[in-house]
């Protein structure tokens, strides 16, 4: 919700202008996950505005579900997606499964933002069973936000 909506720096060092965004705090140190560009501390400014205006919704996709979706996509489409794209694929699969259960017909669109050829080691780790899911608690998030305070003051 809006509890996480605030202004924050776009970089860890705090050199950028303050940006309106949904953020975990520019001092956020993520777990060692294999999600490439998803290690960023906040949603981009445009995405944050779309979320605020209820024109889109954000969903949480754990990395194991993401890699499972990426493997399915690679097997069915012949394209190895980047881990970032695999999160979008997993969300599209979830939505398609909901439609299958309810009988609703929808056009489901996702963005394949890149290939995963640079990140094959992550797929190897997934296939070997060496990856685990990781989730932040609300307490972890609040602690991080308390550390940065209200930067807009």
Q: What are the residue ranges of the model-derived segments?
A:
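Catalytic phosphate/nucleotide-handling subdomain of diverse soluble enzymes
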Residues: 91-151
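Non-catalytic terminal extensions of PLP-dependent enzymes
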Residues: 13-49, 66, 71, 126-153
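Hydrophobic alpha-helical scaffolding
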Residues: 8, 24, 28, 36-37, ...
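Short, flexible coil/turn micro-motifs enriched in small/turn-prone residues
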Residues: 20, 73, 109-111
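Active-site-adjacent helical/loop segments in soluble small-molecule enzymes
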Residues: 41-101
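Short, small-residue-biased leader/transition segments that mark boundaries at the very start
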Residues: 3-4
């Amino acid at each position: 919700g809006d509890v996480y909506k605030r202004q924050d720096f776009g970089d860890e060092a705090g050199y950028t202008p303050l940006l309106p965004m949904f953020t975990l705090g520019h001092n956020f140190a993520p777990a060692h996950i294999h999600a490439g560009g998803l290690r960023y501390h906040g949603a981009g400014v445009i995405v944050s505005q779309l979320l605020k205006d209820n024109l889109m919704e954000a969903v949480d996709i754990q990395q194991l579900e993401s890699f499972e979706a990426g493997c399915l996509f690679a097997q069915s489409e012949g394209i190895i997606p980047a881990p970032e794209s695999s999160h979008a694929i997993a969300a599209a699969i979830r939505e398609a499964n909901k439609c299958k259960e309810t009988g609703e017909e929808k056009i489901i669109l996702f963005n394949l933002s890149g290939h995963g050829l640079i990140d094959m080691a992550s797929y190897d780790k997934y296939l070997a069973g060496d990856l685990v899911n990781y989730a932040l608690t609300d307490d972890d998030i609040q602690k991080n936000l308390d550390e940065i305070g209200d930067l807009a003051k």
